[in-house]
């Protein structure tokens, strides 16, 4: 990867980190804050998430062995996820709305590697930026690093097969990966805090409705931004994308 293609990502990453580390305001949760879920639900979501993490590690090891030149592209996917998911708007109590950034890495490498990349991003934000928490990392990672990428990948393949238009498929993948993350987060919150009147369904409608106000515009914006970044990669990283097409899942197929 050419140095000039790395500079914008590194500058954006550094600026975001600086602003959040030097912010005097209280940080909102990265999805679900530390201690917000009961120990039972925290353990449950960790148990659901960990198998995907293990499979993702195996996929990443395979990628780096077969095509070590793609390590910088993996780093770019992680930086893109970190920067976008750090741009938050306060939403439902104990949570927040923001882009997820997992769509780009999903269409390049497939959903399994993003289970690792996304969870590492969430871990860094929990430790360095006080967004989210360690006990709730399993729940947050399952929604953003598992559900989002798998849904995005499914619709990427579906739209690409139906229309043959790559950029439309990338837009759909990024937008729906974002929206599905928040549908899953709403389900997690509704399961943990069912409404006294109406139970799980009423609570789900409440959480999803509040999220939708901010998340639908954010998801559309993320889809457009991801397409713009893809255009940039095509212009300056054609060799790496050609290697992806030969060796990887995602855009490659």
Question: Locations of the language-model features?
Answer:
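Hydrophobic transmembrane alpha-helices
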Residues: 27-104
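C-terminal transmembrane helix-loop-helix hairpin of multi-pass membrane proteins
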Residues: 169-179, 198-253
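Hydrophobic cores of alpha-helical transmembrane segments in multi-pass inner/ER membrane proteins
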Residues: 46-55, 145-155, 220-231
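Alpha-helical membrane segments and adjacent membrane-interface helices in multi-pass membrane proteins
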Residues: 85-148
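Short helix-perturbing small/polar motifs within transmembrane alpha-helices
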Residues: 143-186
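Hydrophobic alpha-helical transmembrane segments
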Residues: 71-76, 115-119, 142, 167-175, ...
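Membrane-helix interface motif
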Residues: 19-27, 186-198
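N-terminal secretory/membrane targeting signals
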Residues: 1-27
């Amino acid at each position: 990867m050419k140095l000039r293609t790395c500079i914008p990502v590194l500058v954006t990453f550094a600026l975001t980190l600086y602003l959040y580390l030097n912010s005097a305001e209280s940080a909102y949760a990265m999805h679900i804050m530390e201690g917000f879920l009961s120990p039972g639900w925290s353990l449950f979501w960790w148990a659901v998430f960990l198998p995907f993490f293990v499979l993702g590690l195996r996929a990443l090891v395979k990628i780096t062995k077969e095509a070590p030149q793609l390590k910088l592209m993996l780093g770019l996917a992680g930086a893109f996820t970190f920067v976008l998911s750090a741009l938050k708007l306060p939403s439902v109590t104990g949570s927040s709305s923001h882009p997820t950034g997992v769509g780009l890495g999903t269409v390049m490498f497939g959903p399994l590697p993003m289970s690792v990349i996304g969870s590492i991003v969430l871990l860094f934000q929990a430790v360095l930026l006080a967004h989210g928490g360690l006990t709730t990392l399993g729940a947050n990672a399952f929604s953003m690093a598992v559900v989002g990428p798998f849904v995005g990948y499914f619709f990427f393949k579906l739209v690409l097969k139906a229309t043959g238009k790559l950029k439309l498929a990338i837009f759909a993948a990024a937008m729906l990966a974002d929206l599905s993350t928040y549908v899953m987060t709403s389900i997690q919150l509704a399961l943990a805090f069912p409404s006294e009147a109406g139970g799980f369904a009423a609570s789900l409608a409440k959480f999803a409705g509040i999220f939708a106000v901010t998340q639908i515009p954010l998801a559309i914006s993320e889809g457009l931004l991801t397409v713009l970044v893809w255009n940039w990669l095509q212009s300056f990283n054609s060799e790496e994308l050609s290697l992806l097409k030969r060796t990887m899942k995602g855009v490659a197929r």
